Each structure stands twice: as structure tokens, then as C-alpha cells.
Amino acid sequence: MLQEPKVEFLWGDETAVYDDWIRHMARAPVGLPVENFNHQRTQPRKQTLIAAMSAEKVFAPWCFEGSLESDKMLQWLQQLRPQLHENHVLILDNARPHHACKVRGYLADHPIRILFLPPYSPHMNPIEKLWAAIKQRWRQRRLRGFPRLLATLQADLQQIVEKSGKAIVASCSYSSVLS
């Protein structure tokens, strides 16, 4: 009897990354100084980080200046596509660039199986928890500036997924896809 190949789910999303993780507002008990507080008022620079993850691996992490628009989404899909197999299914949220005409046109010519999450359901997207974990790690290390952040990006993402990927996916109610 022929067995169908097992489907492997990937979850994709983007997040904003700032080059200054130091808080600009803080509280302390009356009479005590605030520790680790940056009194300078600077405008942190923003970049967008986009990637896909499975329970075991991170796919096509990419960081760029500005926000995600259809052209950037298309570039990312072009980077991601060579890493995909026919049994992969990419799950995305409903951000506007994910549904753009350019993206739909590309997908018509270069089939990638995509499912969209229901509206307003970030709790169903494991990569949201990966983004929270990476940002927490960078804050704890007090890394500042994009060169320092990006130098550790690939290793940090892979390390978090290798250590906690299955738990992250299961925490989003996808435990049945892990077996």
C-alpha cells in the first residue's frame, strides 16, 4: 500500500526589531535611583525580521529596513521557496502583504501550499512565541545596534527552535502535528 508523504507545517510571520532595547521610561521606589536606565531620548531605528519555522528548524530568516510590503514579501518567498519540499505547508496570518496581488501572481507560477490563520489569532502562530523569545534574549544581553543583533540572529533563532521548538508548537495547540 502506498503511503502519502507526511505533511510538514511551517509558520511564517514578521516582527519589528529595534536597535535600542534599553527602556526610556522606568520606575523605582521613592528615594532610590533607577538602575539600567537610559536617560537619552533617541529615536530607535526599526527593521523588520521575517522567517518561517517548523518544530525543528528556522527557514529563510531575513532582516531589512522598513515595514513589510508586497515587494519584500515576494523577495522573502523567493528566498524561502528553494528550502521547501512538496510536503511543506506554509501557514501565515492575514497581514495585507501576504494577500497582495504580486504575491498571488508569484504563487500561481511557483506553487507553495499556503494556509491562512483565522483573523486575529496570533495565539495560533508559534513563530510569535519565537519572536518573543529572541527579543527577550537580546534584551537580557543588552545588545544594542543592528550589527550586534544581526550577528547573533541565525544562531539564536536556531538554538531556540532546537531547544524549545516542539514545545512552542505544542503550546499553540498543534501537538497532533508533532506525532
Predicted features by range, described:
Residues 21-25, 102-104, 127-129:
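Short aromatic-enriched loop/helix-cap "lid" or pocket-rim segments at secondary-structure transitions
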Residues 5-9, 127-179:
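C-terminal anion-handling pockets and recognition modules
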Residues 93-94, 101, 115-136, 147:
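RNase H-like two-metal-ion nuclease catalytic core shared by retroviral integrases
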Residues 13, 51-52, 77, 93, ...:
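Generic structural signal for small/hydrophobic residues in well-ordered secondary structure
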Residues 70-117:
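RNase H-like DDE/DDD metal-dependent nuclease/strand-transfer catalytic core used by mobile genetic elements
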Residues 27-30, 108, 132-135:
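Short, hinge-like loop/turn segments at secondary-structure boundaries
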Residues 34-42, 110-126, 143:
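RNase H-like polynucleotidyl transferase catalytic core
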Residues 1-78, 171-174:
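Extended, low-complexity cationic-aromatic segments
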